[in-house]
Amino acid sequence: MAKSKGISVNYLRNKEQLNDEIDYKEFKYKKYFELVCKLIPDVKNETLIVKAINEELTNKEGIVYVFVINGKIFKVGESINSIKDRVQSYNCGKLEYRLKGTCSTTNFYVLQSLLAIGEEVEVYGYFPELPEYTLFGEKYKSSKSASKVAENLIIKDFIEEYNKKPIGCTQQ
């Protein structure tokens, strides 16, 4: 693992590292997911470009998502925000920021891995029903708990079925 100033700069370097990952076609939850957008790696600008397949869903909040590269599951994640906003966060995973320690390890790992692999990423999304909360006499809908619970259930089942997490799921 490469290090600079004691900060990890480890990430996937090529698409062959995905060979042992699980095929999306085997993903037992896939019937609940639909293609939302594609991510196009832009190595020159060290960024991911969001190419909406479904504009409404690309901007919809409260998503559980699966990143698929050449049919292989790279990552399962969730966001209380839209996938468009989540990708903007991943785009903060620049090497310069990592060396300064100013970006998260997850954002760095995902962005740099996807840039190094250099393949289009299919993003499939599932949108759990938003739970309704009453706080201080007002009603609110929030995706935070429903999508986080859904992500955790999927990861737990994934580990039970395949004895590992998707390669891009680096958090404990």
Regions found by a protein language model. Give the residues of each.
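Boundary/linker segments flanking structured domains
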Residues: 1-62, 68-74, 79-172
